[in-house]
UniProtKB/Swiss-Prot annotation:
Coiled coil (UniProt feature): none
Gene: uxaC
InterPro entries: Metal_Hydrolase, Uronate_isomerase
Class in the EC hierarchy, top level: isomerase
Record protein name field: Uronate isomerase
Matches recorded under Pfam families: UxaC
Isomerase keyword on record: yes
GO biological process terms, semicolon-separated: D-galacturonate catabolic process; D-glucuronate catabolic process
An MF annotation (GO) of this entry: glucuronate isomerase activity
Database matches in HAMAP family: UxaC
Organism of derivation: Flavobacterium johnsoniae (strain ATCC 17061 / DSM 2064 / JCM 8514 / BCRC 14874 / CCUG 350202 / NBRC 14942 / NCIMB 11054 / UW101)
Keyword match Isomerase: yes
Phylogenetic placement of the source organism: Bacteria, Pseudomonadati, Bacteroidota, Flavobacteriia, Flavobacteriales
E.C. numbers: 5.3.1.12
Length: 467
């Protein structure tokens, strides 16, 4: 181990209680990564990457934003620079990311996957590139073996309703001991004002075998795909929305709006909101029928830089936190479902930290005793997926609800090297509790608090999702 490393056995663990909680109750728990954006083909085909850049930097908009901020030319971020030059420019950036979670993640990932404890910087970059690429090129670092290294029991990718789930099927009977599931992400069927909506419906119709001419046809097509996903092991849905849509509507209004859209006539913003509300209610009622968990990621302000969006497209690092009002529409939406006894298990993630207490109290309105932790306040997401953000989420949930019922961490990542984020979360959780034991705010009952830690690390998710 390098003398200048700060990644050691007790990283982030500030006292003996935190150390005991982590090492005895959390560290060795398997990982259930119930939401990510991994490529299922790479898992099913046990892909071996050419070099560290392809598995670590390509597709990682967290790193891209940092590099651009430092003044790195786009050629070496997403452009036509060589893989090695992109890595060297990332290495140049890393020392300047101190106090950003990228600094911790980077060194945790180098340590856990490659047993490298040197700090990544311009001086160490050549050596680390050579060493990591040599390992990455071997079977021991195939995608399936990368998942085994971190004790991943299950990964749940995210797919559009039109997806064939070809690679989930291919992997279904594997002998690795790893399960791969999928989450149903139908946002393209909801957002009627988006460019290409009609073309998307044509594709959805082809895949589902339903000619989509009316709103009833759209419902039938979506139900067909839910049935297909369910038959292939899907147990979750996911929605990435600025806010929950909930407007009063009638069936005749929705039929008329849908007809207008299919005739390529202009839809007003008010009509779009009514339509989106109708589709969302229909989907959520159907999720309840199939016993799925629905997830809502709320509050992102996306594609802010029109110039770069035109060049690079979405999910390339031009998004930020929005300040949309969340409480009233979310309450009305959940209440409408609950009133008909059609509210399924639900996880709500907020991107704006100002909404932490809003979400932490909202979930209590609809936890009716039918299921343990039925409605969940999700872990710190995206810009909040860091030490301060996760601590604030844990504190809000503890103060307003029951942290003991929390289903814990997820990566929400596109990278096969991001799984140490589970370790990061577990260390933060154990340190938070250990600190309160030390101060006398919690009893020195390691068996009971250790059970709580093990539950949040693994057991609660295992029971909640029933993969």
């Amino acid at each position: 181990m390098s003398a200048n490393t700060f990644i050691h056995d007790n990283f982030l663990l500030e006292n003996k209680y935190a150390e005991e909680l982590y090492h005895n109750y959390s560290k060795n728990q398997p990982i259930i990564d119930y939401h990510n954006h991994l490529n299922p083909q790479f898992i099913a085909e046990d892909k071996i990457f050419d070099n560290i850049t392809n598995v670590w930097i390509n597709g990682d908009h967290y790193k891209w934003r940092a590099m651009r901020t430092l003044g790195i030319d786009e050629q070496f971020v997403t452009g036509n620079g060589s893989d090695k030059d992109k890595f060297l420019n990332w290495a140049k950036t890393v020392p300047y990311t101190m106090r950003n979670p990228l600094y911790h993640w980077t060194h945790l990932e180098l340590a856990r996957y490659f047993d490298i404890y040197d700090l990544l910087n311009e001086k160490s970059a050549e050596k680390i590139y050579t060493e990591t690429t040599e390992k990455i090129n071997s079977q021991a670092y195939s995608t399936q073996n990368l998942l085994k290294k971190v004790n991943a029991e299950l990964v749940c990718t995210t797919e559009d309703p039109i997806d064939s789930l070809e690679f989930h099927k291919k992997f279904a009977n594997n002998s690795t001991g790893i399960k791969m599931s999928t989450a149903f992400r139908p946002d393209k069927a909801i957002l009627i004002a988006n460019d290409g909506y009609n073309a998307y419906l044509d594709t959805l119709g082809d895949v589902s075998g339903v000619a989509i001419n009316t709103f009833a046809d759209l419902q039938a097509a979506l139900r067909n795909r839910i049935e297909f996903f369910n038959a292939n092991g899907c147990k979750l849905s996911d929605h990435g929305l600025d806010q929950i849509y909930f407007e009063d509507f009638t069936e005749s209004e929705i039929s008329s709006i849908f007809k207008k859209k299919r005739e390529n006539r202009i839809i007003t913003p008010e009509e779009a909101l009514k339509f989106q509300s109708a589709v969302l209610i229909f989907l959520s009622e159907t999720y309840h029928e199939f016993g799925w968990v629905q997830q809502f990621h709320l509050g992102a302000l996306r594609n802010n830089n029109a110039r770069m969006h035109r060049i690079l497209g979405p999910d390339t690092g031009w998004d930020s936190i929005g300040d949309y009002p969340q409480a009233q529409k979310l309450s009305s939406f959940l209440n409408a479902l609950d009133s008909k006894d059609k509210l399924t298990k639900t996880i709500i993630y907020n991107l704006n930290p100002a909404d932490n207490e809003v979400m932490a109290t909202m979930i209590g309105n609809f936890n009716d005793g039918s299921v343990r932790g039925k409605v969940q306040f999700g872990s710190g997401w995206w810009f909040l997926d860091q030490k301060d953000g996760m601590t604030k989420q844990l504190n809000a949930l503890s103060n307003m609800g029951l942290i003991s019922c929390f289903v814990g961490m997820l990566t929400d990542s596109r990278s096969f090297l991001s799984f140490p984020r589970h370790e990061y979360f577990r260390r933060i959780l154990c340190n938070l509790l250990g600190d309160e034991i030390k101060r006398g705010e919690l009893p020195n009952d390691m068996e009971w608090i250790g059970k709580l830690v093990a539950d949040i690390s693994y057991n609660n998710a295992k029971e909640y999702f029933k993969f």
